[in-house]
Amino acid sequence: VDMFLDNPNYEFIKGDIKDLDTCMKACEGVDYVLNQAAWGSVPRSIEMPLFYSLNNIQGTLNMLEAARQKGVKKFVYASSSSVYGDEPNLPKKEGVEGNLLSPYAVSKRCDEEWAKQYTRHYGLDTYGMRYFNVFGRRQDPDGAYASVIPKFIKQLLHGQKCRINGDGKQSRDFTYIENVIEANLKACLAPHEAAGQAFNIAYGGREYLIDIYYGLTKALGVDVEPEFGPDRAGDIKHSNADISKAKELLGYDPEWSFQRGIAAAIDWYKKNL
C-alpha cells in the first residue's frame, strides 16, 4: 500500500473485518465497497475450519451490515470458483453447482447467500465475483499455501525443484489480475437488475498445469524436471468458466489472455524477486 499513502483520496485503516466497529468506520461516507478481505487456500481451510468461518463468513457479514447501515450504494465482494464443488460439467455455469468440497468453499457459498439476503431485504446492491485462479504481479510466492504460478516462478528463478500435486494433467481457467480489476469496476457500474447475483470472473480458457510448468521453464531458460506428489484434498481435476453472464449483465470483457498475463507476471517477478 506504500504507493498510495501520499494520495489525499486514500485512507489506510488497519483493522479486522471480524470487528463490526472497524467495518462501520471503513464504510463511513463510502458509495462503493469492493470487499476482497478473506482467507484463501482450500487445504488450509480443511485444517482450520473454525478460523475460516469466523473470518470469511462473519467478516463478510460484518461488512454487509456496515454497508447497509452506512448507506453504501454498491457492494462488490470476492467469491470463488470453489462454490462449484464436485459438479463435473464444463464449462462451469452459474446456477449449476455441485456438492462443496472444502470449508473454504462453504464460506464462499455462505457469503453469496448472505449477500442475496441483503439485496432482497435491505435493497443493498450486491455483486459476487466468482474468481477463477487469479494470478499476477505482487502475488505472494512464499509459504505452504502460495498459489502455483508465483511459487513455480520463484523456485525456478532460484534453481529449486518444483512439486506438482497430482499428475499435472489437471486444468484451470487461470485469470490475470487485470481482468479481475476490470470485473470489479464493471460491477460498480452495473444496473440494479443485476444485483443479488454471482458472476464467473475468468478469461474463459483452460490451461493444464504440466503445460504451464514447462512453459515457465522455457520462458525462464531453465531445465529442471518437476517432482510429483499426491493430489491435494478438496481439489477438483478440471475447471473452466462460462463468462457469458458477466459479459451480458456487467459488460465484462477480459482483455488479458493467459499468455499475455503470464508474460507480464514473469517480467514482474524477474525484476522484483
Where are these regions (language model features)?
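Short glycine-/acidic-enriched loop or helix-start segments at secondary-structure transitions
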Residues: R44-S45, D86-P88, R138, F174, ...
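Hydrophobic alpha-helix immediately C-terminal to the catalytic Tyr-X-X-X-Lys motif of short-chain
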Residues: C110, W114, Y118, V148, ...
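Conserved catalytic loops of nucleotide-sugar-dependent glycosyltransferases that act on lipid-linked
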Residues: P141, S147-V148
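Active-site helix-initiating loop/hinge in glycosyltransferases
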Residues: N56, G136, D173-Y176
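N-terminal Rossmann-like NAD(P)+-binding domain of SDR-like oxidoreductases, especially those catalyzing
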Residues: V1-V134, C188, P254, A264
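Heptad-repeat alpha-helical coiled-coil signaling segments
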Residues: N62, Q139-D140, Q170-R172
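C-terminal substrate-binding subdomain of Rossmann-fold SDR/epimerase-dehydratase oxidoreductases
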Residues: G15-K18, L156-L273
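Generic structural signal for nonpolar/small residues that stabilize regular secondary structure
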Residues: A115-Y118, M129, G136, F152, ...
